[in-house]
UniProtKB/Swiss-Prot annotation:
Descriptive protein name: Putative defensin-like protein 79
Keywords: Antimicrobial, Disulfide bond, Fungicide, Plant defense, Secreted, Signal
Record bears the keyword Acetylation: no
UniProt record similarity statement: Belongs to the DEFL family.
GO terms for cellular component: extracellular region
Statement: the UniProt record of this protein carries the keyword Chloroplast: no
Signal peptide: 1-31
Subcellular location: Secreted
Transmembrane segments: none
Annotated source species: Arabidopsis thaliana
Listed GO biological process terms: defense response to fungus; killing of cells of another organism
Length: 85
């Protein structure tokens, strides 16, 4: 009896940790996919300029008919080596 309760406790603990981990990964993945798209007929250069003023850059889709602005920052990468003195 004691071993069954122990196994159930470990199973519940594993399920809880797995759920938290998966929710964290899903949130991280979705945070880099936030785009606001406007159906504008402007050049790609104008799209980039307009998006740079209000967000973290833009991209043209459908040959410039759709302008999408990125609303979340790109990932940051840091060099693990300290700067040389």
């Amino acid at each position: 009896m004691k071993s069954e309760k122990s196994a159930d406790a470990y199973g519940t603990y594993f399920l809880l940790i797995s759920t938290i981990f998966l929710l964290f990964i899903a949130r991280q993945a979705s945070s880099y996919q936030m785009l606001i798209c406007l159906d504008l007929n402007i050049s790609c250069a104008d799209c980039q300029k307009q998006c740079d003023e209000t967000s973290y850059g833009g991209m043209c889709l459908n040959g410039g008919r759709t302008c999408c602005c990125k609303k979340s920052p790109p990932p940051s990468y840091y060099d693990p080596r300290p700067p040389s003195s």
